[in-house]
Amino acid sequence: MNKHALIIGASGVIGSNLATHLLAQGWKVTGVSRGRTPVPAGCVSLQLDATDAAAVASGLAGIDASHVFFTAWARQENEKENIRVNGAMVANVLAALGQNGHAGHLRHAALVTGLKHYLGPFDAYGKGSVPVTPFREEQGRQDVENFYYEQEDRLFEAAEKYGFSWSVHRPHTIIGYALGNAMNMGLTLAVYANLCKANGQPFVFPGSSAQWNGLSDMTDAGQIARQLAWAADSPAAANQDFNIVNGDVFRWKWLWPRLAAYFGVEAAELPDTISPLAERMDGAAEQWRAIAAQHNLVEADVSRLASWWHTDADLGRPMEVMTDMSKSRKAGFLDYQDTPEAFFTLFDRLKAERVIPL
């Protein structure tokens, strides 16, 4: 049976890695983006604002997708706006595909959210009753406003109406190759380390003592791509929610010196108070332009590489955050990715692509 994937957010860190993975498996892939960053080679590119219902209906007319993957979100000023805008993205796309879905074309829709399902949104960390780690799918929703819940509800509603199966995927922080992405810790830390090296400064952990000392895990973009592909046609994954992480655990106080050693910078001890990157990177734009010119790098705009705010938010959490993968494994997804290796593989590629200095 032919497989045609429609990927919403195909130029992002998850969407681009998913597109590459599906293309290698022989899928037809249509990649939806706003056009600021190219989609992977081999994708049919569709520039579209998924928040615009009329544009979505027009742009997706005639698209006979068998599977749709939601891998993007649009950050707004507050959670009410996050709910309105990001819920509409899911609703608009599924409504536009609905008639095709009712006719039997659309078989499955996958939604990528994240661990804020358990923690609450960025501006409400810890306001609900945060579950005990490791987070498990049956722990359910927090009693706070959260755009993830709105997206899920729109997904469930459309699946019941049009008769396709669904899956929800909850990664931890993503490591993967993508430029111009709003949430990319691996690239952010690579840029930060190179700025430290250029300035002769130590590599200071920008987060909390809870994150430094507690157990943690992460999600490689290739790992979630493989789970999304597996869930697309696996009966055991139909109408299920799954956590998705690499499968190992670590402590930042163990990993941080290893990242520093890769870049040849000094790993500082944990400071007495949190030292957010956003407060220390005022001069980063000018400094990065100089580094890019000196090393002939492909991107001189640091804002397209580093997401200081997102890395601060993840590493500044006041609690331990880690995830249980038992449900996914019991259902048949057994893939594993070594986390330090994921970082170093990403850093090697960033050097090879001239994103960071050799």
Question: Where do the PLM segments sit?
Answer:
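Glycine/proline-rich active-site loop of Rossmann-fold NAD(P)-dependent oxidoreductases
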Residues: Y162, G176-Y192, G222, W230-F242, ...
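Mid/C-terminal beta-alpha module of Rossmann-like enzyme folds, strongest
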Residues: I224-T311, G316, D324-S326, K330, ...
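NAD(P)H-binding glycine-rich loop region in Rossmannoid oxidoreductase-like domains
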Residues: T37-P40, V44-N92
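A conserved pocket-lining segment of Rossmann-fold NAD(P)-dependent short-chain dehydrogenase/reductase
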Residues: V191-T219
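Active-site Tyr-X1-5-Lys
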Residues: Q139-H172
